[in-house]
């Protein structure tokens, strides 16, 4: 019985070693550099033109987002400025002149 148990652990150890080696072989086999097309030529990563197009699209998207943020902040600031001017005008209309102001205004007449 001990010999059977010992054999099972040895087999399990060999399986683990072989599985890690098999995994390494599979990873090395399936890299992007080793992909072969129908013509038989190995195709590398993305070509230079597609990288250029991706970069231009990224720059365009970042410009649009930046302009959106800048104009959003600008219009928010303008809106707050208009509201604050309206509040100031509202407060000025509700203020009552003091008695000293009336005395000064009435005095020269």
Swiss-Prot record:
One of its GO terms (biological process) is regulation of cell cycle. The chain crosses the membrane at residues 56-76. Keywords: Cytoplasm, Glycoprotein, Membrane, Phosphoprotein, Transmembrane, Transmembrane helix. The keyword Signal does not apply. Induction: By p53/TP53, following X-ray irradiation. 'Reprimo' signifies stop/repress. It comes from the Eukaryota. May be involved in the regulation of p53-dependent G2 arrest of the cell cycle. Seems to induce cell cycle arrest by inhibiting CDK1 activity and nuclear translocation of the CDC2 cyclin B1 complex. InterPro entries: Reprimo_fam (IPR043383). It is a single-pass membrane protein. This is Protein reprimo. One of its GO terms (cellular component) is membrane. The modification Phosphoserine is found at residue 98. Glycans are attached at residues 7, 18. It comes from Mus musculus (Mouse). The gene is Rprm. Belongs to the reprimo family. The keyword DNA-binding does not apply. It is found in: Cytoplasm; Membrane.
């Amino acid at each position: 019985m001990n010999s059977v148990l010992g054999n099972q652990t040895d087999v399990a150890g060999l399986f683990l070693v072989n599985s890690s080696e098999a995994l390494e072989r599979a990873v090395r086999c399936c890299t992007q550099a080793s992909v072969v097309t129908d013509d038989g030529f190995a195709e590398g990563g993305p070509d230079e033109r597609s990288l250029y197009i991706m970069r231009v699209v990224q720059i365009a998207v970042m410009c649009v987002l930046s302009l959106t943020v800048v104009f959003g902040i600008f219009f928010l600031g303008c809106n707050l400025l208009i509201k604050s001017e309206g509040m100031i005008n509202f407060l000025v209309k509700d203020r009552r002149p003091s008695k000293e102001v009336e005395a000064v205004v009435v005095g020269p007449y």
